Amino acid sequence: MSLENKNIIITAGGTGGHIYPALAIAELLRQNKANVTWVGTPNSMEASIVPEYFNIQFIKSSGVRRKGIIKKITFPLKLAYNTLKSRSLLKKLKANLVIGFGGYVSGPICLAAAQINIPVIIHEQNAKIGLTNRILAKFATTICLAFEIENLHKQFSSKQLAKTKIVGNPVRKDIVALNDKARIYTDSSTLKILVLGGSQGAKAINEIIPKLIQKSNEQGINIKVWHQTGKLSLEETKDAYKDISQNHIKDIAAFIDDMAIAYNWADLVICRAGALTVSECAIAGLPAIFIPLPSAVDDHQFFNAQNIVNNNAGFCLRQQQMTLENLLAIIKPLNQDRSKLEQMSKMAKKTLIKNSSEQILDCVKKILNNK
């Protein structure tokens, strides 16, 4: 089915975990000749990222979780107002379908679409369903999940379960291409570790890695690190490396522009367990040590990591467990026997769905074909 002249609305915002999977789908829809418009919130991450690629419209929207009593009282009124404005926007755009990728902005747009009989697809990136998507699941035409979710039958009605599909997380094509490339773990004397602090950085991870390199060197483990610190921690982290030989450092940077190159370079990654990072590591076949963000809502990062850990493709340490001793207890055996890394890589590639974007596109075509 052709999507030519179909007006499809993408709504996602707040964090990269919502925005980047949505961008992957938006690009695929455009390649299929759909007219794509993004709806986000002003003064947010999507406002600085999306305009380079797509037309974006803005509505004001905010969450209620962990807010004061006044904001909780006024939230229903604001939601009703934003939903009404969203209805006007969708009519103006002549929307044929809305795809919500989470973030508070998805709420009013998807609710408005359901009210005026526009089909809605929602996509949940995490292994715990977020508050917005839990509400929207009642109104969605199709519910797409990235992971198998524990006790889903207790959260969804039989009607909701019937319209639920596990599709994985959309990731960039250059990362998907790594899935077909065999990782060769030789008996090289150097163990290449990619450290990802996330876009905002991860202070605890940034602080311990320089100490890990020093301790590893003392024990005869030769680590070379490519360390993405996040903008706020760059100078502080660089300072922590000042006494470490450059032979152990590939790069220390606030951001990595080309993640496919970084994933391809590494033998092992140490990172948080955001949905997109977990999906990219698995699809790229990169063994990981996940350190879930302790403050993540509903502990969703821990559950994201379990999809990989339970398939023997990675490890998970709570932040309070992230000691030099525990990290070395994982790294030392992997360094001594590289075949373990190779086996983990093979298992990682089998863990998650790599054609997620195409599966979501198929959902779009089926819905529009039946309208």
Curated annotation (Swiss-Prot):
Classification via NCBIfam families: murG
An annotated GO cellular component: plasma membrane
Pathway the protein takes part in: Cell wall biogenesis; peptidoglycan biosynthesis
SUPFAM superfamilies: UDP-Glycosyltransferase/glycogen phosphorylase
Binding, UDP-N-acetyl-alpha-D-glucosamine: T15, G16, G17, N126, R172, S199, I256, A275, L276, T277, V278, S279, E280, Q301
InterPro entries, per the entry: GlcNAc_MurG (IPR006009), Glyco_trans_28_C (IPR007235), GlycoTrans_28_N (IPR004276)
UniProt-recorded name of the protein: UDP-N-acetylglucosamine--N-acetylmuramyl-(pentapeptide) pyrophosphoryl-undecaprenol N-acetylglucosamine transferase
Membrane topology of this protein: Peripheral membrane protein
Family: Belongs to the glycosyltransferase 28 family. MurG subfamily.
